[in-house]
UniProtKB/Swiss-Prot annotation:
It holds the Pfam family HATPase_c_3. The gene is mutL. This is DNA mismatch repair protein MutL. Keywords: DNA damage, DNA repair. Signal peptide: none annotated. GO terms for biological process: mismatch repair. This protein is involved in the repair of mismatches in DNA. It is required for dam-dependent methyl-directed DNA mismatch repair. May act as a 'molecular matchmaker', a protein that promotes the formation of a stable complex between two or more DNA-binding proteins in an ATP-dependent manner without itself being part of a final effector complex. SUPFAM superfamilies: ATPase domain of HSP90 chaperone/DNA topoisomerase II/histidine kinase, DNA mismatch repair protein MutL, Ribosomal protein S5 domain 2-like.
Length: 647
């Protein structure tokens, strides 16, 4: 007898469940997507013990006909595709026909459904076996309950996280679905406590306000663009509103939430030099395209996709975001930095707390600013500030964060309900309706961000603090300018232009500069000699593992030539493949930082005026190349409120 045999359906479903049903969040995702495919306009999600004990999904969709109920729980049975051509033109969220049989094989499942024009169907399945099937009275739609998930696969239960973690995974996926389909009203409950309620009025900004807070919604920039193949719509936050994780960016393709690293990267590139290192925006981007241009049949979870015109799409996203930011004055209000964390900090990691300790600023050596002596000799910088009273220094102490003890999940021992599900109490209370109406009103009252160009407003200097910050004013209030960041931006745009030119003047070194490398480093640099010439670095081989540099571009900062050469060589060695665009960018950023005014350097009035005038000529006068803000605004109203002149 042969060794190879065909597996029975029950074992096949258990194996398939390993890919489709990883955790309770997978069950919620698949069932809610089925409800959306069934044209539901209202969906309720009820959880007990983060879904490990019970998941109940109630919708008002098309329902399932009696003759289809049994077939729906067979593998690869679906109403969404019929032939091979449909597989390449998928418009629905589900299509594989694996979710329902996989879920039923590892749980105790109860289904009540009706199409509205015939009696409903009541079905009970335990571990893939049909226990009960009968007709029942039911409204149009589907009511499906999944209990005791993984009851027959105890090994899977061992790998489940705590209730808090599993609930965080569920809320994350529900939030993404809510953003993907603002036309559907979603309600999420855990142990009878409401976690989310969206109105279903189609306003995605209202959904974002429900998830991330009304304060974040006020800082959203609308994004819209169209090409021959793609249509992009969405919202992204101003650069002043950032988070420490990429999880706050959501990408939707043809109504389906997807995880795609290159799309995330394109959004980040749209914020080029506007975000600090390690900070990410909150964003929602919906992309519509011909289904032929995207392959969603990559993984059973359907979270990964492939694009056939990927580079064209990425370019469109980058250019659209950059064009939007060029229309806005990106000056953060001082209030943004002093507010406590908004509720959205806990959206993706609901039960984890981010601890941050302030870093002390470094104080590099003092150098005079560049670019200020074009027409006249630079006045001597003031080395000592006026003798003013200074308050005693106090060390900042972060508040003690609340830490909850996580509890392990214990599976419920309740038997499956053999009777039809009773109608639960109505959650549409007057109080809940009022809260939703109040949110709708707040969102309607949000003023659109002005897109009148990003020119720096007129600023009139009035002083300097600690040799680091310049104070200026105009009719809109007080501005504080970081002098180092300001000149860093000026120098960056100057060097970026210079590094980008292949034909450039060079200056001979009096003594050739020798660079000794390890064999691995030498071979890597040798491969990139032509690329290095494009950024003005001309190397000659000198011995077995050395190079010499005889000249350098004239725009290298004086006295820092060898240091810059070493830095550029280090970048080449560090990168496995040299991206000439990135290399030029890094070189410009490095030189701009080294050539800029340092902290604790007091400037004369002439120097301050010259600095602000040069800043005005830059294409982006609002952030340094590292993404830190150059200036912060205190409105006149805020100042009056601080001094109780207004209440």
């Amino acid at each position: 007898m042969g060794k190879i045999r065909k597996l029975d359906d029950q074992l096949s479903n258990l194996i398939a469940a390993g890919e489709v049903v990883e955790r309770p969040a997978s069950v919620v995702k698949e069932l809610v997507e089925n409800s959306i495919d069934a044209n539901s306009t209202s969906i309720e999600i009820h959880l007990e013990e983060a879904g490990l004990s019970k998941i109940r999904i109630i919708d008002n969709g098309d329902g399932i006909a009696e003759e289809d109920c049994i077939v729906a729980f067979e593998r690869h049975a679906t109403s969404k595709i019929k032939d091979e051509n449909d597989l390449f033109r998928i418009r629905t969220l589900g299509f594989r026909g694996e979710a329902l049989p996989s879920i039923a094989s590892v749980s105790e499942l109860e289904l009540i459904t009706s199409t509205g024009d015939a009696p409903g169907t009541h079905l009970i399945i335990k571990g893939g076996d049909i226990i009960k099937q009968e007709k029942t009275a039911s409204r149009k739609g589907t009511d499906i309950t999944v209990q005791n998930l993984f009851f027959n696969t105890p090994a899977r239960l061992k790998y489940m996280k705590t209730i808090h973690t599993e609930l965080g995974n569920i809320t994350d996926i529900v939030y993404r679905i809510a953003m993907s389909h603002p036309e559907v009203s979603l309600k999420l409950f855990h142990n009878e406590k409401k976690l989310l309620h969206t109105s279903g009025n189609g306003d995605v900004r209202q959904v974002l306000a429900s998830i991330y807070s009304i304060q974040v919604a006020k800082k959203l920039v609308p994004i819209e663009a169209e090409s021959l193949d793609f249509t992009i719509k969405g919202y992204v936050t101003l650069p002043e509103v950032t988070r420490a994780s990429r999880n706050y960016m959501s990408t939707i393709v043809n109504g389906r939430y997807v995880r795609n690293f290159v799309l995330m990267k394109a959004i980040q590139q749209g914020y080029h030099t506007l975000l600090p290192v390690g900070r990410y925006p909150i964003g929602f981007l919906s992309i519509e395209m011909d289904p032929m241009l995207v392959d969603v049949n990559v993984h059973p979870a359907k979270l990964e996709v492939r694009f056939s015109k990927e580079q064209e799409l990425l370019k469109l996203i980058e250019e659209t975001l950059q064009a939007a930011f060029k229309k806005i004055q990106l000056i953060p209000d001082a209030g943004v930095t002093t507010k406590k964390k908004e509720k959205d900090e806990s959206v993706q990691e609901q039960f984890q707390f981010e601890h941050a300790k302030p870093k002390e600023p470094s104080m590099p050596d003092i150098v005079l600013p560049t670019g200020m002596d074009a027409k006249q000799e630079e006045p001597q910088a003031v080395k000592q500030p006026p003798q003013l009273w200074q308050p005693p220094k106090q060390e900042w102490q972060p508040p003690q964060s609340l830490i909850r003890e996580e509890q392990s999940w214990q599976p419920s021992t309740k038997p499956i309900i053999e009777e039809p599900i009773q109608e639960e109490k109505s959650w549409d209370s007057n109080e809940e309706d009022f809260e939703l109406e109040e949110l709708e009103e707040e969102v309607r009252e949000i003023k659109e961000i002005e897109m009148n160009g990003n020119d720096l407003p007129p600023l009139y200097p009035i002083g300097q603090m600690h040799g680091t910050y310049i104070f200026a004013q105009n009719d809109k209030g007080l501005y504080m300018i970081d002098q180092h960041a300001a000149q860093e931006r000026i120098n960056y745009e100057y060097f970026r232009d210079k590094v980008g030119r292949v034909a450039q003047e060079v200056q001979e070194l009096l003594v050739p500069y020798r660079i000794d490398l390890s064999l691995t480093e030498f071979l890597r640099v040798e491969e990139q000699l032509e690329e290095l010439k494009k950024v003005g670095l001309f190397l000659e081989q000198f011995g077995h593992q050395s190079f010499i540099v005889r000249s350098h571009p004239t725009w290298f900062p004086k006295g820092q030539e060898t240091e810059i050469i070493d830095e550029m060589m280090e970048q080449v060695v560090k990168l496995k493949k040299v991206d000439i665009k990135k290399l030029r960018e890094e070189a410009a950023i490095m030189m701009s930082c080294k050539a800029s005014i340092k902290a604790n350097q007091y400037l004369t009035n002439d120097q301050i005026f010259a600095l602000l005038e040069e800043l005005r000529t830059t294409t982006n006068p609002y952030t340094c190349p590292h993404g830190r803000p150059i200036l912060v605004h205190h409105s006149t109203y805020e100042l009056e409120k601080m001094f109780k002149r207004v209440m």
